[in-house]
Amino acid sequence: MAKAPVRARKRVRKQVSDGVAHIHASFNNTIVTITDRQGNALGWATAGGSGFRGSRKSTPFAAQVAAERCADAVKEYGIKNLEVMVKGPGPGRESTIRALNAAGFRITNITDVTPIPHNGCRPPKKRRV
């Protein structure tokens, strides 16, 4: 007896009005993740994954392109408002926020969540080049 062909159901995207953009800006790369309020990832993009390699990966323009790609990835969820959490000292901090604003999101809050030790571990020794 032959089985009936299994039809793939079209995946229904849940509609989210408010989201959180997590920006991790290191000296070498920028990672942009947009989540819902509970922290479930809806879409993400990186400067390295956007086609930039080597030292070009750590530029503000690469971070801007990553933010635009992440914004395109989550457009179908219907996000209108974004809360932005920025972590790290990298060059892509400001340009990422500008790109998200230009993509049509209304930025409600910008928070710096860079981890700062209360005199924790000893830092690595200084580089000698």
UniProtKB/Swiss-Prot annotation:
* Cystine pairs: none
Q: Which InterPro entries match?
A: Ribosomal_uS11, Ribosomal_uS11_bac-type, Ribosomal_uS11_CS, Ribosomal_uS11_sf
UniProt KW keywords? Ribonucleoprotein, Ribosomal protein, RNA-binding, rRNA-binding
Q: Which PROSITE patterns match?
A: RIBOSOMAL_S11
Has keyword RNA-binding?
Answer: yes
Q: Name one GO biological process term.
A: translation
GO CC terms? ribonucleoprotein complex; ribosome
What's one GO MF term for it? Answer: structural constituent of ribosome
Q: What family does the Swiss-Prot or TrEMBL record give for this protein? A: Belongs to the universal ribosomal protein uS11 family.
Protein name stated in the entry: Small ribosomal subunit protein uS11
**Native organism taxonomy:** Bacteria, Pseudomonadati, Pseudomonadota, Gammaproteobacteria, Enterobacterales
